[in-house]
């Protein structure tokens, strides 16, 4: 399993990337409610994914209310695809 990217393989980060892979962008509140995790947990995972170059963070204001949205980068999409391919290889491996 050494070929599985640990930044993706962590269950919560995998769920985040799966959600982002199906949309152009998602805001913090949507991810928070959908994943049912704490704000601190989500912030920590998003920071890790941003540092890996897998997500892009955009901070804006809607009126006076701050809004943070996230989208999958090209590198993030490619890494997620590579991750699935690695899982397929593991799944189809035959003993012996």
Where are these regions (language model features)?
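Amphipathic alpha-helical dimerization/coiled-coil segments
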Residues: 1, 18, 74, 78-96
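N-terminal helix-turn-helix DNA-binding core of bacterial DNA-binding proteins
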Residues: 2-38, 60-69
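Short, hydrophobic-biased segments on the C-terminal half of alpha helices
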Residues: 46-47
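Short beta-strand "wing" residues that participate in macromolecule-binding interfaces
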Residues: 57
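Glycine-centered, phosphate/nucleic-acid-interacting loop/turn motifs that mediate DNA/RNA or nucleotide
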Residues: 53
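Residues in the helix-turn-helix
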Residues: 41
């Amino acid at each position: 399993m050494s070929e599985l990217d640990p930044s993706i393989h962590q269950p919560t980060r995998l769920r985040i990337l799966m959600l982002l892979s199906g949309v152009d962008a998602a805001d913090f509140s949507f991810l928070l409610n959908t994943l049912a995790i704490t704000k601190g947990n989500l912030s920590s995972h998003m920071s890790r994914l941003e540092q890996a170059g897998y997500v892009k963070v955009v901070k804006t204001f809607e009126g006076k209310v701050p809004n943070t949205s996230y989208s999958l980068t090209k590198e993030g999409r490619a890494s997620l695809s590579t991750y699935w391919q690695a899982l397929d290889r593991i799944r189809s491996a035959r003993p012996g």
